Amino acid sequence: EMRGYATMIKVLFICHGNICRSTLSESVFTHKVNTLGLENMFVIDSAATSREEIGNPPHRGTVNKLRELGIPLVPHRARQVTLDDYDKFDYIIGMDTANIRNLNRMLKHDPEGKIYKLLSFAGSGRDIADPWYTGDFDETYRDVEEGSEGFLNYLREKGKI
């Protein structure tokens, strides 16, 4: 059923450049939501803390990993997170400690408690390593998959879905 925009669950995935981890998360989580038939309940997007990759498409490692898994790539151009995003989104989900630190600085120290680290939803304090440096998109995918599943379970427990 189509929800009104105000009641939709608005999720923004964040990483440093918005070409590797956050775009992978956006596509993986979108696929999970679509598979569950919940696409009308969510607004899902991604953004960067940095300006380095603005306007660039997802990294070829992200594109290739999704293709290998048969998960549709959500088309995206890298953009930097804004204060408007803070007002718009309910969950602003970073990948590592540096993302969280930068988000807190950029988004007025998170007065509404919207900033989370993805693997915290899977009961872990671990960072998701940046495959731009590691080259290991398999490990990144496993972490993103685990965090996304944990986030869905969190939303179920909260009675949101």
Predicted regions and their residues:
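Conserved active-site segments centered on acidic
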Residues: 3-88, 153-161
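Phosphate-binding/catalytic loops
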Residues: 91, 97-161
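Hydrophobic structural packing positions in well-ordered secondary structure
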Residues: 15, 66, 93-94, 144
